[in-house]
Amino acid sequence: MEHEVTKKGLLLDAKGRIMEEGWARKPLWIYQREQVKGGRLRIKEWDYYAVINQQKQYAVTATMSDLGYAALFAISYIDFTRKAVSQKDALTFFPLGKIGLSSSSDMDNEVAWANKTLRFAFVKRGEKRHLMFACPSLVLPDGSIGLDCDFVLNQRKESESLTIATSWKEQRKAFYLNEKVNCMRAEGTIRRGMKSEQLLLGEAWGVLDWGRGRWTYQNTWYWASLSALVENIPFGLNLGYGFSDRTPASENAIYYNHKIDKLGEVQFQFNSGNLMEQWHIQDKEGRLDLIFQPVVDRSSNTNFVVIKSSQHQLFGSYSGTCKLSDGTTLHLDGLLGFAEEVFNRW
């Protein structure tokens, strides 16, 4: 039975176990890294942003993460029209909490990192998330060289987001605290090569995947997301499953006009031998019936024997129907988003 948490409180008890598992419409759990039990290398923390321009048919993503063994910094540019992706990443080893990622997604914070190839700065101030990231040497799908993004994502104070806190049946000291913030209207500029372009009002939307946890060694997950306008109203989806005990909380929800409309279990039906074929996504209550058509696979593979990762983040379009809890049926027609299959041994 899923459990909605409504009061703020500490995430972990003195033994390192979640005090109240469930889901919430706001980030209510107080995360303290020093309270995590089971070794610092098992702690995984990340801020992942994706901004998708529905009108101009492109997406950009930026990641800053502390995975214990290593810190990963990554930038990608997805061109839906050319069906191509450009990406660049960098690793540093044994960051162990030194990057400066925040202990709460709603606190004001600054985190920055740079090397000779990449530079990042994520700044949170009130209702605005200022993202500055660049890769001057990135060769884009159209042949131009260099990507420089300066975006502001607007997260209204009254907007709801989906936060879950769950643990693993086999190891209750292993936990996953995660917030997905959809439908953040994006402003700012993007420079591709020598061409700079201002985002137009309402054409681009951002999503934040804010994750903190103490993980078990091997996991596979599935995640799907989109943020757009449907009949001129902000609409989003966050769907996912695959790891930890989701009895008290799934991370499945419709975002509509900045409010959470909670869903139960969902299932992704796809050809594991060819992820570029259509995916069929449904829920058990009959509220979702979606076709996801991938157009490009942002894939990466890492194998250091002890640490192994295989990631397929597919960008494409969603079509189908979503039924709100009040009975209203919304029709989606080619809205851009993504779905992913990720395996990690870390």
Predicted segments with their positions:
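Structured soluble/peripheral alpha/beta segments that form catalytic or ligand/cofactor-binding pockets
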Residues: 1-346
